[in-house]
A protein has these predicted regions:
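Residue-level detector of alpha-helical hydrophobic segments embedded in or interacting with membranes
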Residues: 10-11, 56, 299
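Single-residue recognition of alpha-helix boundary sites
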Residues: 14-15, 48, 78, 299
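Structured, acidic catalytic/metal-binding patches in enzyme active sites
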Residues: 23-247
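A cross-kingdom marker for long, charged
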Residues: 242-315
Length: 315
């Protein structure tokens, strides 16, 4: 009787263990916090990223995903950062890469790296076409582990790099995609022009005006970052970026909407692939605020097991 009970228990317990070995995924609920950014901010509101950094540090992420193009995505690099691509490839041809030293340094903890290591890694990541990690190690080379005392007025210098240092991150994970950048910009611009005749241009103008008025008070109190991540603000940016404010659709507005959705779908695919592959439970994505609504919706369909969090969520 005891032997039968043991056999039954083994039959129940073994399949999950085998599954875990086959997939490589630990049985842990994974989550993603998405923080929307303002990109570069005016000097008058230079400290706007402070509340976002405080919020992100409190979350204590284990992996940081950023709005930069993956090094393997040559088409996006050509479309969006051609100068970086040309510089990277020219340096690679002229100098090559010391892969042995690079791999040795990747084994070390962030606190173990020396200033000359930061310089080497910045140069190496540049030659590898990795702008995200080039920017990170260039920041470390310039300001050290203590970081910049002065606000740099952008998400890299005031949010991403300080956050990465605080958790001891040695690598950022880029997930952006710009394969159809030119087509999207043309469609969006033509939609705006067509809106002057249909009256939709006034709708967009009203959305922008409402945003300008509502951001004044938060900006004065150093809370522009928090305002940007309110649900109402994110929804406005979503409507404008995807041309969903349009009441009389045309070929250009339809194209802009589709291209915007497709870009965010590809970003979501990149995120899903990396989050499933990595062992971390708590992940954070730092990306332009206009993407937040799109990505939350798409990820909810693509990766329903992933728990998605926003700053605006009720505690």
């Amino acid at each position: 009787m005891i032997r039968k009970i043991i056999v039954v228990l083994i039959a129940i317990l073994v399949p999950p263990a085998v599954y875990a070995q086959e997939t490589g995924e630990p049985h842990v609920s994974k989550e993603l916090l998405i923080i929307g950014t303002m990109h570069e901010v005016p000097s008058i509101v230079s400290r706007s990223y402070r509340p976002l950094l405080k919020f992100a540090k409190k979350y204590q992420p284990e992996a940081i995903f950023v709005e930069d193009i993956r090094p393997c995505d040559t088409l996006s690099l050509k479309n969006f950062t051609p100068r970086l691509l040309n510089t990277a490839d020219s340096l690679f041809r002229a100098e090559g890469i010391d892969e042995e030293r690079f791999l040795e340094l990747k084994k070390k903890q962030l606190a173990e790296l020396e200033p000359d290591d930061f310089a080497f890694l910045a140069n190496t990541y540049l030659k590898k076409r990795d702008r995200a990690n080039y920017s990170y190690y260039n920041y470390l080379k310039t300001y050290g582990m203590a970081g910049s005392k002065k606000a740099l007025r952008n998400e890299n210098g005031d949010l991403i790099c300080p956050l990465a240092i605080s958790i001891g991150a040695t690598e950022l994970i880029p997930v952006d995609d710009h394969k159809t950048e030119k087509e999207y910009q043309q469609a969006w611009s033509n939609t705006a022009k067509a809106g002057k005749e249909t009256g939709d241009a006034q709708i967009m103008a009203d959305l922008l005006k409402k945003d300008r008025h509502k951001r004044v008070w938060p900006s004065l109190w150093g809370k522009l970052g928090k305002y940007t991540n309110k649900q109402e603000t994110l929804q406005r940016f979503y409507l404008i970026n995807s041309c969903r404010y349009v009441t009389q659709p045309n070929e250009w507005s339809n194209a802009a909407r589709q291209l915007w959705d497709d870009r965010n779908y590809r970003i979501a695919e990149n995120l899903t692939e990396q989050i499933k592959k990595n062992p971390y439970q708590k992940n954070i994505l730092i990306i332009g605020a206009g993407h937040v609504i799109s990505l939350k919706t798409i990820l909810g369909q693509m990766y329903p097991e992933l728990k998605i969090k926003l700053m605006s969520d009720k505690k």
